[in-house]
């Protein structure tokens, strides 16, 4: 497949950003391979490395399979992995930002250290043509939701200018506090949306994790349509179990993806499930991506 107009802009942009390194890459054996066709449908589909659980693939093997299956990119990879993603025409769709699930940006004492890490992550993402950096609120640990909201807004207000200047979106992740992450503060869409409203920047949005918000709220499609302007990225997994979203779980992902696509959403939907041990990981990934071709 030739690198032409049929290759989506972000994928072409990622390769163009690193184009000055082409000669060096060829010499060192990391030049881009021929790009596989992306998945059909209106949504760009990405992956988290958890989908390869149960395989013995190294990073290059994972990138090779991701490209073969028509993925747009891979989430939560840092600069050391950018060259191998580039080799297979994959975008680093979400870059780690330096905050943590338990210790995050809702606590002022973390702001100096995490702010420096976040600024570096934004620079790394911009240099690679990566669209997003992840942020995590952190656990409550005695902090009220209102104080935590104020602290989170303060942090993101301090980071929004470098994000805006470098065209990178900082995505605050919504997680469930009921099953997987007891105490996590950013556990409801309304709280996350309020953060985004107060910061008021096109480069501060939410990472809407469908699995987590199904546990906390349900009503996924209506919630997404109401708040799509504040959503910069999606994660998928089946519930219960956080495995593949087949007929062993409760959500209709074809319907959910259609609802997302109907909003005109232009970002990425990345699969973050872990395949059941009785399933072939690569066959499962192919099947899950087919479900989301809407």
Which sequence ranges carry the predicted segments?
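Active-site-proximal loop/turn and secondary-structure-junction residues that shape catalytic pockets
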Residues: 51-53, 78-80, 98-100, 139-141, ...
């Amino acid at each position: 497949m030739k690198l032409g107009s049929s290759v989506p802009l972000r994928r072409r942009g990622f390769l163009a950003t690193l184009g000055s390194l082409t000669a060096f890459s060829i010499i060192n054996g990391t030049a881009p391979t021929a790009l596989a066709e992306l998945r059909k449908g209106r949504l760009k589909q990405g992956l988290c490395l958890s989908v390869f659980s149960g395989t013995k693939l190294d990073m290059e093997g994972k990138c090779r399979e991701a490209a073969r299956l028509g993925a747009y990119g891979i989430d939560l990879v840092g600069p050391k992995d950018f060259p191998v993603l580039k080799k297979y025409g994959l975008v680093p769709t979400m870059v780690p930002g330096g905050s943590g699930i338990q210790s995050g940006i809702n606590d002022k004492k973390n702001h100096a250290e995490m702010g420096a890490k976040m600024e570096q992550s934004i620079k790394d993402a911009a240099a690679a043509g990566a669209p997003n950096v992840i942020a995590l609120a952190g656990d409550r640990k005695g902090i009220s939701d209102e104080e935590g909201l104020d602290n989170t807004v303060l942090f993101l207000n301090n980071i929004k200018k470098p994000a805006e200047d470098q065209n990178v979106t900082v995505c605050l992740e919504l997680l469930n506090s009921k099953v997987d992450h007891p105490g996590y503060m950013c556990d409801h869409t309304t709280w996350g949306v309020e953060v985004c409203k107060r910061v008021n920047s096109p480069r501060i949005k939410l990472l809407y994790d469908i699995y987590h918000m199904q546990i906390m709220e349900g009503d996924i499609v209506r919630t997404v349509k109401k708040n799509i302007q504040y959503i910069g990225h999606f994660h998928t997994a089946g519930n219960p179990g956080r495995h593949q979203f087949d007929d062993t779980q409760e959500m209709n992902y074809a319907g959910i993806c259609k609802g997302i696509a109907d909003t005109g959403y232009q970002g990425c939907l990345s699969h973050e499930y872990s395949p059941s041990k009785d399933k072939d990981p690569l066959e499962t990934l192919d099947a899950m991506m087919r479900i989301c071709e809407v």
